[in-house]
From Swiss-Prot:
Gene name in the database record: dnaN
Chief location of this protein within or outside the cell: cytoplasm
Family as reported in the entry's similarity comment: Belongs to the beta sliding clamp family.
Its biological purpose: Confers DNA tethering and processivity to DNA polymerases and other proteins. Acts as a clamp, forming a ring around DNA (a reaction catalyzed by the clamp-loading complex) which diffuses in an ATP-independent manner freely and bidirectionally along dsDNA. Initially characterized for its ability to contact the catalytic subunit of DNA polymerase III (Pol III), a complex, multichain enzyme responsible for most of the replicative synthesis in bacteria; Pol III exhibits 3'-5' exonuclease proofreading activity.
BP GO annotations: DNA strand elongation involved in DNA replication
Subunit structure comment from the entry: Forms a ring-shaped head-to-tail homodimer around DNA which binds and tethers DNA polymerases and other proteins to the DNA. The DNA replisome complex has a single clamp-loading complex (3 tau and 1 each of delta, delta', psi and chi subunits) which binds 3 Pol III cores (1 core on the leading strand and 2 on the lagging strand) each with a beta sliding clamp dimer. Additional proteins in the replisome are other copies of gamma, psi and chi, Ssb, DNA helicase and RNA primase.
InterPro entries linked to this entry: DNA_clamp_sf, DNA_polIII_beta, DNA_polIII_beta_C, DNA_polIII_beta_cen, DNA_polIII_beta_N
Gene Ontology molecular-function annotations: 3'-5' exonuclease activity; DNA binding; DNA-directed DNA polymerase activity
Keyword DNA-binding in record: yes
Protein name as catalogued: Beta sliding clamp
Keywords: Cytoplasm, DNA replication, DNA-binding, DNA-directed DNA polymerase, Nucleotidyltransferase, Transferase
Gene Ontology cellular component list: cytoplasm; DNA polymerase III complex
SUPFAM superfamilies (alphabetical): DNA clamp
């Protein structure tokens, strides 16, 4: 039966990832548990929520091989509260799992391994590797505009697709569109799948982990599943959304009548300040643009009003340039602008306008492989 010795800090991190996968209110006990398998000097931790399956291997001292399942939440809560030290985990059979630390001991109820589902197999139609850094970039640049409307299920995730050596992520909620891509080293079969929001968030946490961020991630695609292999010791398998993502190219403005170039941080900070006055029912800020100034203003029902002026400047730290003699006043949901401005770390941001009712194209000169479209609102 299972017996192993492991460092607390090693176990904490893996349990954190596992706990994040498991649904907090899972009514099926088997899916609320984590499977622990000790073999060949490794502890494999398996967790699932039926749509998503995560397997992690960590190096431990295996005294005796074995496997069991135990409450993910309880085990995670205990280990997180323990000081850094060695832990001994022992399967005591009918009396459960013993967790023994320096000055403490816990006994947890277990369930048989036979009740825990295995990871599904996948027959990949396409597979490739990219750096975790690149993968994190395209997910972070698009995840915030995923639709939360469950009736539009085909928009409830990021659209991962391959076209002509470009690996692209896109998402939209009908009010905004986010697109980010990287170039692959070799030609791969064109493919497109919709990765659910939960799965996108979980794999993003894994690839951004310090031990993974400088490594590659292998991605295997089929029509209904996607498999991620990161650092060889972490495997995530996810179901895909069965739907068709809209042809987003039709929503990208092809022309504009005016262009704003501004310091990203100054613009973002100003919008965030002015947005404080807005109310949830109708969130809108107005941008009043001219060659000389940008005025950002808002009126909040039963709160008051606010205004901030940014002057024309060629200085990099306060850059503002509007290229039209025609002044423009246009409104936006401030959250939509804030999300875009926070997603891409760049000194400057470019906004391309056609008229007050047309969608606005947003680009970053230092990040040409990120494109955003935001619909304006009436103010």
């Amino acid at each position: 039966m299972l017996k192993l010795i492991v460092e607390t800090k090693t176990l904490v991190q893996s349990l954190g990832f596992a706990s994040s996968v498991v649904e907090k209110r899972n009514v099926i006990p088997e899916y609320a548990n984590i499977k622990l398998s000790a073999k060949d000097g490794n502890l494999e931790l398996s967790s699932t929520n039926m749509d998503l399956y995560l397997s992690q291997k960590i190096a431990v001292q295996v005294v005796s091989e074995g496997e069991l399942t135990v409450s993910t939440k309880t085990l995670n809560d205990i280990v997180r509260k323990l000081p850094d030290s060695e832990l001994t985990l022992t399967d005591l059979g009918t009396t459960g799992l013993e967790i023994k630390g320096k000055n403490c001991k816990f006994n947890l109820f277990t369930l048989p391994v036979s009740s825990f589902p295995p990871m599904d197999s996948i027959n990949p139609e396409a597979s490739f590797k990219i750096s975790c850094t690149d993968f994190a970039k395209i997910i972070e640049s698009t995840k915030f505009s995923i639709s939360l409307d469950e009736t539009r299920y085909n928009l409830n995730g990021v659209y991962l697709h391959i076209k002509d050596k470009e690996f692209c992520s896109a998402s939209t909620d009908g009010h905004r569109l986010s697109i980010s891509w990287v170039t692959l080293e070799k030609q791969i079969k064109n493919f497109g799948v919709i990765l659910p929001q939960k799965s996108a968030e979980e794999i993003l946490k894994i690839v951004k982990d310090p031990k993974n961020i400088n490594e590659d991630i292998e991605i295997l695609l089929s029509s209904n599943k996607i498999k991620f292999i990161c650092n060889e010791n972490t495997i995530m398998l996810s179901k895909l959304i069965d739907g068709t993502f809209p042809d987003y190219s039709a929503f990208i403005p092809e022309s504009s009548s005016s262009k704003l170039v501004i310091n990203r941080k100054i613009f973002a900070d100003s919008i965030e300040r002015i947005a404080i006055i807005t109310v949830e029912k109708f969130r809108a800020v107005k941008l009043s643009l001219s060659r000389e100034t940008l005025e950002i203003s808002a009126v909040g029902e039963a709160r008051g009003n606010a205004k901030e002026v940014i002057n024309s400047s060629q200085d990099k730290e306060s850059f503002y340039e509007y290229n039209s003699d025609e002044s423009l006043a246009i409104g936006f949901n401030p959250q939509y602008l804030e999300d875009v401005l926070k997603a891409v770390k760049s000194d400057l941001v470019e906004l391309y306008f056609s008229d007050v009712s047309a969608p606005v194209l947003i680009k970053f000169p230092e990040n040409p492989k990120d494109i955003f479209v935001v619909m304006p609102v009436k103010v």
